[in-house]
From Swiss-Prot:
Na(+) binds at G162, C165, T168. It comes from Burkholderia multivorans (strain ATCC 17616 / 249). InterPro entries: ATP-dep_Prtase_HsIV_su (IPR022281), Ntn_hydrolases_N (IPR029055), Proteasome_sua/b (IPR001353), Proteasome_suB-type (IPR023333). This is ATP-dependent protease subunit HslV. Its EC number is 3.4.25.2. Allosterically activated by HslU binding.
Length: 178
């Protein structure tokens, strides 16, 4: 059976502000199944942003588990991510999930990979998904050469990724913490 795939999620942190955004396209093979999916959300009393890429059902399963870890560790983003990664590596069912997450709170941004790794991105910029490389390159160039806000950088990066990646559209959801 073919997998649902393709999206772009990008996060930019600058100073005391962070923005996390994603497109809305869900693709099954070469068919666009939905154009307005919401892959970026606020969780834990609106204090944590999370964006997901990969298999849709897998991503929702990981998101649910991450939220449970966040509750268990009273909003400690790093601890919740590390605990989820431990489970991911040791649980046979979790190891089969094909998804990635970007999480961010007021102080920290983390990427949780499909291998169960937790990465702290360099320079406060990270992106995942099929258009992630385009978005990350654009975000990095904009961050280094402009005074745009994180939200503006995320918006422009997603626009560029949507122009270049066939699995990324121009329906964007962007959340910020300031």
């Amino acid at each position: 059976m073919e997998q649902f795939h393709g999206t772009t999620i990008v996060s930019v942190r600058r100073g005391d502000k962070v923005a996390l955004g994603g497109d809305g396209q869900v693709t099954l093979g070469n068919i666009v199944m939905k154009g307005g999916a919401r892959k970026v959300r606020r969780i834990y009393n609106n204090q944590v942003l999370v964006g997901f890429a990969g298999g849709t059902a897998d991503a929702f399963s990981l998101l649910d588990r991450f939220e449970a870890k966040l509750e268990k560790h009273q909003g400690n983003l790093t601890r919740a991510a590390v605990e989820l990664a431990k489970d991911w590596r040791t649980d046979r069912m979790l190891r089969r999930l094909e998804a990635m997450l970007i999480t961010a709170d007021a102080n920290t941004t983390l990427v949780i990979t499909g291998n169960g790794d937790v990465l702290d991105p360099e320079g406060g910029i990270c992106a995942i998904g099929s258009g992630g490389a385009y978005a990350q390159a654009a975000a990095r160039a904009l961050a280094e050469n402009t005074e745009l806000s994180p939200r503006e950088i995320v918006e422009k990066s997603l626009e560029i990724a949507g122009d270049m990646c066939i699995y990324t559209n121009h329906n964007r959801v962007i959340e910020t913490i300031e």
